[in-house]
């Protein structure tokens, strides 16, 4: 089979117009009607021209032909392909060459021919003219220069990549596919086969290059030369280092200390200067004695160092306190900075704000204290009003009963005054008094004959003290107390009740008495009977409200 491009006489990258022009020209030349003297040969050539144009004029047919051109030219895709490329396996032995000369059977001549044949095959499978014009480095001869020939050759061929497409290795003919899905599957399998064959060919060529390079005398000579150069460089570096050490050692031996750097000379000069200053100020004769005295003083004052340090620390604390601004919450390092800060506008604003806050706090505290005192006074007034109301009601009943049950009791002795303990609760614990609300069986003693002569203030005091013992359940307590005292009415004890049991100090108001008990701790515990009586009085006062 002949190549279609060669039949039409065009290049492989020819355009459709070029193909059409070439086809018309050849068709007119080889048409059978115009070649009657050689009709059979003309007809055969005309068939080839027409078949080539039919394939190349169709884009799909042309693409498939370009991919399978080599296979078609060498037997077709049906498996009858005969690969006429060079067999590289036979060149992996040392028996393929004799010696390392440039003769026909020498090392360099044999492998030069091998790589030239590989280059020829690669150019045949190139699609573009640019690929054909690419230069493949030559293997060279036994005397070729390493840098210009040998190094370039091995640099290219050690990374060799073939241009062959290995279309003859395909297993399926995509033209025989019944549908596009089957065609795609065939193309996928054919691509895998081509890639595998291409990879194997590249690896084979690279292995051959490694085999040749290992035995190339030019490479060995260059390697030896490089080793010698490296050894010579290392030797020179070592020699240079040794010379530097010797020169440094020599400089160290020849070094002399300068007079201005000698410490001994400096010490002498210092001593001389001290002696001169001592003579000038009259301290030279006593310098040694002064030193001894100073040492003794230092030893003697060891114990006083701690005290001095403590005093210094206290002074430093005072100093730093003076450098602290509480209004701005800032500390300063010097008196000047503190003074500048105290003159600043921001500092004055902060001081005014702080002063205002302190005044507001003082006002709020004083107001709270005043309100608390007013509340206490109001509570006292309320208690007094309640007691007055209750006493008025009960005194009115007593007066009624006195008119009916008044009997002469002038001969009865007065009941002795008793001091009751002060309770801890807000209610006062008073001595029990006879209740005017008792039944008629209980005799009510008459007042003392001198009662009519008493002033009004005394009478009111007796009425208030009697009214405090009244309540809803106060009658029972009054009965018990009257029986215990033989039915004699107790004397008024209001003034006695505002007295501290512990220190016997009298107070004008209950608030003062309670403040005294809280501050001194003179409060005493009540008995169970007194506590129950006090709670009952509280309940009675609440209900009467």
Swiss-Prot record:
Keyword set, alphabetical order: Chaperone, Coiled coil, Metal-binding, Repeat, Zinc, Zinc-finger
Q: What are the disulfide bonds? A: none
Bias type Basic residues, positions: 339-348, 394-406, 535-545
Q: Is Lipid biosynthesis a UniProt keyword of this protein?
A: no
A Pfam family for this UniProt protein? zf-C2H2_jaz
Functional note: May act as a co-chaperone for HSP70.
Coiled coil regions, renumbered to chain: 180-286
The gene designation is dnajc21
Where is the sequence biased in composition, kind Acidic residues?
Answer: 129-141, 283-295, 372-388
Which molecular function term from Gene Ontology is one that the record holds?
zinc ion binding
What ranges of residues constitute the C2H2-type zinc fingers?
323-347, 498-522
| Entry GO terms, CC | cytoplasm
* The protein, known as: DnaJ homolog subfamily C member 21
Region described as Disordered: spans on this chain: 122-141, 276-302, 331-497, 522-545
| PROSITE patterns hit by this protein | DNAJ_1, DNAJ_2, ZINC_FINGER_C2H2_1, ZINC_FINGER_C2H2_2
Coiled coil as UniProt keyword: yes
Which InterPro entries does this entry report, sorted A to Z? Chaperone_stress_response, DnaJ_domain, DnaJ_domain_CS, J_dom_sf, Matrin/U1-like-C_Znf_C2H2, Znf_C2H2_jaz, Znf_C2H2_sf, Znf_C2H2_type
**Matches recorded under Gene3D superfamilies:** Classic Zinc Finger, DnaJ domain
Q: Which residues form the J domain?
A: 3-69
């Amino acid at each position: 089979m002949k190549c279609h491009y060669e039949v039409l006489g065009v290049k492989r990258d020819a355009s459709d117009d070029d193909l059409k022009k070439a086809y018309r020209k050849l068709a007119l030349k080889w048409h059978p009607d115009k070649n009657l003297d050689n009709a059979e040969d003309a007809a055969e050539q005309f068939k080839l021209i027409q078949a080539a144009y039919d394939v190349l004029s169709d884009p799909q047919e042309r693409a498939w032909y370009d991919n399978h051109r080599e296979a078609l030219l060498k037997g077709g895709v049906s498996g009858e392909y005969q690969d006429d490329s060079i067999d590289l396996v036979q060149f992996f032995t040392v028996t393929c060459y004799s010696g390392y000369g440039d003769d026909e059977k020498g090392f360099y001549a044999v492998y030069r021919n091998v790589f030239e044949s590989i280059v020829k095959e690669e150019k045949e499978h190139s699609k573009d003219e640019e690929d054909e014009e690419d230069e493949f480095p030559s293997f060279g001869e036994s005397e070729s220069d390493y840098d210009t020939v040998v190094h370039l050759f091995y640099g290219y061929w050690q990374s060799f990549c073939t241009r062959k497409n290995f279309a003859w290795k395909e297993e399926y003919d995509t033209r025989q596919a019944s549908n596009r899905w089957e065609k795609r599957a065939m193309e996928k399998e054919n691509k895998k086969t081509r890639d595998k064959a291409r990879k194997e060919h590249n690896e084979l060529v690279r292995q051959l290059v490694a085999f040749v390079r290992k035995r190339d005398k030019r490479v060995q000579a260059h390697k030896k030369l490089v080793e010698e150069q490296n050894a010579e460089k290392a030797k020179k570096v070592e020699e240079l280092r040794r010379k530097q050490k010797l020169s440094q050692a020599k400089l160290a031996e020849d070094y002399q200390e300068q007079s201005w750097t000698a410490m001994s000379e400096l010490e002498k000069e210092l001593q001389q200067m001290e002696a001169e200053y001592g003579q000038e100020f009259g301290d030279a004769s006593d310098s040694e004695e002064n030193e001894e005295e100073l040492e003794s003083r230092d030893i003697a004052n060891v114990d006083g160092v701690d005290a001095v340090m403590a005093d210094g620390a206290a002074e430093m604390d005072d100093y730093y306190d003076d450098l602290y601004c509480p209004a701005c919450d800032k500390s300063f390092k010097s008196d000047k900075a503190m003074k500048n800060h105290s003159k600043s506008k921001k500092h004055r604003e902060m001081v005014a704000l702080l002063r205002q806050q302190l005044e507001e706090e003082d006002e709020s505290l004083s107001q709270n204290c005043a309100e608390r005192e007013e509340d206490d006074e109001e509570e006292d007034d309320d208690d007094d009003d309640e007691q007055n109301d209750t006493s008025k009601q009960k005194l009115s009943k007593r007066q009624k009963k006195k008119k009916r049950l008044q009997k002469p009791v002038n001969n009865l002795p007065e009941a002795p005054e008793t001091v009751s303990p002060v309770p801890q609760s807000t209610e006062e614990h008073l001595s029990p008094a006879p209740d005017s609300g008792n039944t008629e069986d209980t005799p009510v003693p008459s007042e003392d004959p001198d009662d009519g002569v008493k002033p009004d203030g005394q009478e009111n005091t007796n009425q208030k003290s009697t009214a405090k013992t009244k309540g809803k359940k106060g009658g029972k307590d009054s009965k018990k107390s009257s029986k215990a005292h033989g039915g004699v009415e107790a004397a008024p004890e209001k003034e006695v009740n505002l007295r501290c049991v512990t220190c016997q100090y009298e107070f004008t108001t209950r608030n003062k008495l309670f403040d005294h008990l809280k501050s001194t701790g003179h409060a005493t515990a009540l008995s169970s009977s007194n506590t129950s009586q006090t709670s009952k009085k509280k309940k009675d006062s609440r209900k009467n409200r």
